Amino acid sequence: MKRELALEFARVTEAAALAAYKWVGRGKKEAADQAGVDAMRTMLNRLAIDGEIVIGEGEIDEAPMLYIGEKVGQIYNEEEKDSVTYVDPVDIAVDPVEGTRMTAQGQPNAITVLAVGKKGSFLKAPDMYMEKLIVGPEAKGKIDLSKPLEDNIHAVAKALNKELKDLMIVVLDKPRHKELIKDLQAMGIKVYALPDGDVAGSILTCMIDSDVDMLYGVGGAPEGVISAAVIRALGGDMQARLKLRSEVKGASLENDKISKFEKLRCEEQGLKVGEILKLEDLAKDDEIIFSATGITGGDLLEGVKRKGNIARTQTLVVRGLSKTIRYINSIHNLDFKDEKITHLVK
């Protein structure tokens, strides 16, 4: 995979962020998601890649999606395919708007993300729930999801040479985590309760200017695979296991029906619900490019700032082979954007 593609993928997430930004604070999360999807798809189809979406989103919440199995790249673009001379075959994991609710409500930490790897790089996880335990490089090799969470916390604290009162753990602020958050706080641990967006929370475990030491909890499997890609690129560690909807949301006719479908999907892909997945199972190669652009400002990235038709974005790009982290600050004149996305971002 040509390293020059890193900048091209940054342009993809920038476009998605600019498009989603138009819906910040308007209370319409589906519209924000659709805008991000449309911009991301348009930009991916301008690149010299033979890409396949292997991680998308939309089956759980019926959101607009770049669907799993969708082909993207210039060779699938009727207007440009005849001019293509070389393409990189790649698998792509996307979350066009991570934090649709936060975008709709004008809240911080909404981002747009994608991870790209060679064919076969990513676990093709069904769109279901996933339990995740994530740490940064200094605690790599110290986590084991088969052991109680408390044992893992003590192991990480020892690796980081910290007391429990100095640890900070990211947990999604969801009803399912209410008791978990209370238990962690009772141990003296600082809990950073994010309303949504565990990809951003995952990355914070690996950043040198972050106070976050660990992420734990249940979130989406698609986001889990994207997190694994960037965590591997950053040198951190992760373990996970797939969870049925009925395990997470409780038994009901609807949840049980969905859980049966999830089991079937797992069987079709050779996966077992509840089996521990290590980082290497989720992201199988170091040749990964990850890009994220802020929509609303947050702990990881600044959000889009716009004055008239001039906009500013901040993008994080990570290249797995070199472990290089880049922040790209861009100023966009929306009057001169690619004509294919002008109506989406302007």
Descriptions of predicted regions:
Residues 5, 204-346:
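Oxyanion/phosphate-interacting regions
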Residues 184-193, 198-204, 208-215:
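Glycine-rich ThDP/TPP pyrophosphate-binding loop and its adjacent helix/strand module
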Residues 87-98, 102-121:
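DPxDG-like acidic metal-binding loop motif
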Residues 65-67, 104-107, 126-128, 179-185, ...:
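Short acidic, glycine/serine/threonine-rich loops at helix termini
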Residues 53-57, 92-94, 103-105, 124-125, ...:
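General beta-strand structural signal in soluble alpha/beta enzymes
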